[in-house]
Amino acid sequence: MPEEPLAERRRSQADKLIELVTAERAVLFRDQFNEPHAHILVDDHWEIWRVRSKQFRRWLCSLLWESEQKAPHSNALTSALTIIESRACFKGEQITLENRVCWYEGALWYDLSNRNWEVVRITEGGWEIVTDPPILFRRYAHQSAQVVPDTSGDIEALNEFLNLAKEEQKLLLLVYL
């Protein structure tokens, strides 16, 4: 393995970790409660992680390992997280994170909470699955992935299982659903 330049060897692991976060195009920001987050490209989609989460910490460790085949020292990791957190809070934009569902620009947006971070956009004209929505959603560990909607379904098929006397009642129930 070639010898590292002296200046490169003197840079702390914390500094290297901070630079790697920037190089990976992570967007640091704070939410409406002033909590630091990162918007990170994972495979082919974007995810939002709290900076102090285990997931972000593990990702940070993997960045250094992939870059230098070294594990970060505990103090370096703590220092880097503190600086990243500070940059998110004081230099990052404030972005409102929504929880599961929100109304935005004439559409209802519903987070499917699935592995691909897909969202359903619902308008008067129908619905579509969006992979890069204009709004961001907060995720919690207890949230389960939702069923992905299917265009081949027929909501009228529910009528055969309903015991409703009047046609208007069926319509009212279907509108409610």
Region spans (language model):
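Generic detector of solvent-exposed, compositionally biased contiguous segments
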Residues: 3-8, 77-95, 146-156
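Extended aliphatic helical segments
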Residues: 21, 27, 42, 51, ...
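Short coil/turn segments at secondary-structure boundaries
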Residues: 31-33, 97, 171-175
